[in-house]
Structures are given as C-alpha cells and as structure tokens.
Amino acid sequence: MDSAVTAVLAGKYPAKQHARRVAEALKASGHDGSGVIYLEGTKTRMAEDSDEAVPFRQRRNFYYLSGCELADSYVTYNIDQDELVLYIPAADPDEVMWTGLPLSPEEALKKYDVDKVLASSEINAHLAHYCTNKETAPKRVYAIPDRVCAETTFLPFDDTNWDALSNALNQCRKVKDDYEIALLKRSNEISALAHLAVMKAAKLAKNERELEAVFRSTCLSHGSRGQSYGPIVAAGVNGATLHYQTNDMDLEDLVTGERPSLLVDAGGEYRLYCSDITRAYPLSGKFSVEARQIYDIVLDMQTQCMDMIKPGVAWDDIHARAHKVAISGLLRLGILRGSEEELFEKRISVAFFPHGLGHYMGMDTHDVGGNPNHADPNPMFRYLRLRGTLSPSEVVTVEPGVYFCRFIIEPYLSSPELGKYIDSAVLDKYWKVGGVRIEDNLVITQDGYLNLTTVPKDPEEVERIVQQG
C-alpha cells in the first residue's frame, strides 16, 4: 500500500472543511450565507418479521459533513457561528450486553472533525438553542426533503429551505479534496489486489461464484469491508449483460471442454469511498481470435478517450470519440458495412456500445453531479451519466465496451433501414464473445489526469498472469 496515502488517511476526515464549502455553495447560489444546515444519518431498520437489522448503509451527504458511520446520528452546521455539531446515540443498557459500549461523546470528539458531540436525543433541544437569542438567531434551516424524521422539528426557525442544500452538496461532492482522493486511491489499491487474485485463480476455477468469492475475500482481508456494488463476474455470453449479477455459471463447456473469456466488473469500498474497475481476459489463458480482436478495439477506444482527458473538454466529445473508434474497428472486422461517417450518423455503434463512456465516482459508484439526461432523443447520449465539461479534482471512470447482446442487436438486424449496415454472417462468429469492457478510475488534474487504477490490461500481460496462475 502507498505510504503517502496511509499518512494522509491517518488524519481526520475533513468534515468541517466540507461544511464550510457547502455553506459557500449555498451563498454562491443566491442565499444569504446565514442559517443552519441539518442532515440525518441512516436509521437502524429491522428486517420484516425478524429481530435482525437490515444491512446498514450510511447516507452519503451526512457522511460528507461528519465522517461518521454510526447509525441514528445527526449533524448540524451553524453557518454564522462556524460550529459543526455531531449527535450520536447514547448508551442503551439493554443493548450493551449484546453489542458492547457505543462510542462515547469524548471518543467521538477525538475521532471526528467536529466542534461538539451531543446525544442524538438532544437534537431538538439544540436546534431550539440556536434560536434563543432573537437578535443573533439564524433565521433559516437548510434540509433535504424526505430526509428528516418525524421526531425532528424546525418550528424555532422562521423558514425552512428544502431546495438548496441537495444541489449545494452535489456541487461540492463533485470536486474531491486531497483526503477524498487518498480514500479513492486506497480503494483502488485494494481492488487492484483483488482483481489480480481473480486473474490468478481464473484458470482453475469451475464456476463464476468461485471468482466472486476470491474478489470479495481479498478485499475484506485488506480492509475493504464492503463492495461498491454487486460484483459482475460474467463468463462468455453473460458478458453481454451490462450489469449481470447471477455469477453462477460453470466455466467449462461439458461437451467441448472450452473455457470462454471472462468479464469482471468489481470494486471494493474503503471507508465509504468507491472503486469501479473492469477487466476482461481468457479463462484458458489465451484469447480466442474473435475475443482478442474485440479486446483490441475496446483497448483502443479507452486509450484514445484517455488521451483527450483534461480540464475544459466536453465529456460528450470524449464519448463520441469512443463510438468513432468502435465504428472503425468493427468496420475492419467486417461486422459493419458502409462509411464511418454514415454509420456514426445512423448511430449504428449504439447496438454494440449502448451505455455511456463513464461517470463521476466518489462515495457513490455513480456519483452525484453528472447531470444525465435520460430523455435525450439521441440514443448515443441517452445513457451518458456525465454531461458537461471536466474540471480539476473531479474523479471519473472511463469504461468503453463492445457487446454482442441479441436483445439489443437483433432489432437492428430486422430493421429495413438499419439492417443493411450489419453483416450478420460475420456477426455470427462473435456472439460467443459476449462482451468486453475495460474500465479505469481517473482524477482530473490541472493538465490531464492521474490514473488510480493499476490492474494490468495489456493483453499479453493479462494472458501471462492467467496462464501462470
């Protein structure tokens, strides 16, 4: 692990700095810069007909202003007084025998970057306390709709603003500080070890689920206690399903003994910060001719797109470049027919590359602030999760792919207008490839990018790793 990352993460999560940034964003959006910001953490929720709690996932906006992973907690930031207060559950004698003593206010104050720690039960009293002096009392509280429990009251305040806080948080969370980038680096470091472990286990594995287990266990053993999303471990034609989750197919044909290629899209989560990495490689240790041809196209798509990345460049333009490279490659193979210009104009490549090139990444895999437009009439951009220009300290994924999904492609083949652009006889050789996607995580810098992802992707190197096991 990178010692420089470890040194950064030895400090406190910069919650106070984040609170100040959000306050500045509120002011920049036309508000007077006064008031109290209010956020709740995730509540403990019990599974139906059970005394077990459902798996806990902390609210990301709450964590951004607290650094706290405890359930049933609150945070307030008094903008005028520059005071950040965390409210955590007090000890419940009935629970201590089962779960041990909870974090005390004194321990929490040492652990978190806040000015004061109170009990969760004191939230209403402290909100009222803000308003005891009418001359200096904040007039407004900023909160998020449907993120305030019934027990909380804002009656002491003259006004509750339900519109501004979510947008301010989204704008701030887009731009990562050094501490957040260190968390994302560590998440990538752990996930790189896990991807490499899967590559080494691939040749002898019998079922997709075995390789999912390798990924999860490697992450856990290195401090990543959760996954950014459900791992995608897709062999052969399963790789044509973008978010395949079954992960339960045998990896060897019982009749021929053939082993297909594998697509693994998986990322561990470290202290709520994500990684999102995809690699594809042959389970036998040697790409088939068709799989290698598609792999080379996708790697070229990613390389050319990454060459364009720097501040001020429109993500739409980078995404369009990926489609143009895909068209050129599929034309060379004879899968497509016609001119590059006409194929791009007709959006034929969408049949093989239906999703967006990438997205913001942070505490959420598909992080906030991307401004997608799923109503876009242009099918090439409809599923693009990031619309706009790049800025320094944003973190994006770059994940081009080429897929052979019958459900998507066959309507093109049967279309009188579009079918002529695809040679079905040539296409028939590629269905078994399933899909190839290559995905890295990049930090936008002042003059380009920093690639956080170190998992090998050179095809010869990948083959060698799988062969050696």
From Swiss-Prot:
Residues given in the record as Mn(2+) 1 binding sites: D276, E399, E439
Cofactor: Mn(2+)
Keyword check for Amino-acid biosynthesis: no
Keywords associated with the record: Aminopeptidase, Hydrolase, Manganese, Metal-binding, Metalloprotease, Protease
Free-text cofactor note: Binds 2 manganese ions per subunit.
Pfam families with a match to the protein in the record: AMP_N, Peptidase_M24
SMART domains xref list: AMP_N
EC number: 3.4.11.9
GO biological process, one term: proteolysis
Disulfide bond entries: none
Protein family per UniProt: Belongs to the peptidase M24B family.
The protein's role, per its UniProt record: Catalyzes the removal of a penultimate prolyl residue from the N-termini of peptides.
Name used for this protein in its record: Probable Xaa-Pro aminopeptidase PEPP
